């Protein structure tokens, strides 16, 4: 199993992230929403509202957030969580940067 599939399997197919209503895989139409809505075409319209991008140091998806950060207008911030993978930031309370989230929302809400 490739590393990305292993990470998601270790979360969604095991007790940690399992849900009884899950079919355990993507459907043929799972990606249709992404294909029909080009997310990055509108990222600059978020400004002047601030954006906080949180990425795991070892997340396979970090490139997506880094690209989104580059495309976003100010104000923006990119925050990296050391030692975190993609799914670690779902439920690993020892890695989720609660202090950063609190300071961001306190300052910007």
List each model region and its residues:
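Acidic beta-to-alpha connecting loop that harbors the catalytic carboxylate
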Residues: 56-59, 83-85
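Short beta-strand/loop motif that positions the catalytic acidic residue
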Residues: 46-47, 52-55
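Hydrophobic, well-ordered secondary-structure elements that form the walls
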Residues: 46, 76, 101
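Conserved beta-strand scaffold positions in the cores of enzyme catalytic domains, especially
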Residues: 78-80
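Short, conserved loop/helix-junction motifs that constitute active-site signature segments
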Residues: 44-47, 71-73
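Conserved loop-alpha-helix segment in the C-terminal half of the alpha/beta-hydrolase fold
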Residues: 57-76
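Alpha/beta-hydrolase
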Residues: 1-44, 60
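Catalytic active-site module of serine/aspartate enzymes centered on a nucleophile-bearing elbow/loop
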Residues: 82-109
């Amino acid at each position: 199993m490739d590393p990305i599939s292993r990470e998601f399997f270790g979360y969604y197919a095991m007790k940690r992230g399992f849900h009884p209503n899950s079919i355990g895989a993507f459907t043929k139409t799972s990606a249709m929403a992404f294909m029909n809505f080009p997310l990055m075409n509108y990222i600059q319209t978020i400004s002047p509202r601030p954006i906080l991008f949180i990425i795991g140091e070892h997340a396979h998806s970090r490139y997506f957030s880094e690209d989104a950060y580059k495309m976003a207008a100010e104000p923006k911030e990119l925050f990296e969580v050391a030692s975190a993978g993609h799914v670690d930031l779902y439920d690993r309370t020892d890695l989720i940067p609660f202090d950063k989230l609190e300071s961001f929302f306190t300052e910007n809400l």
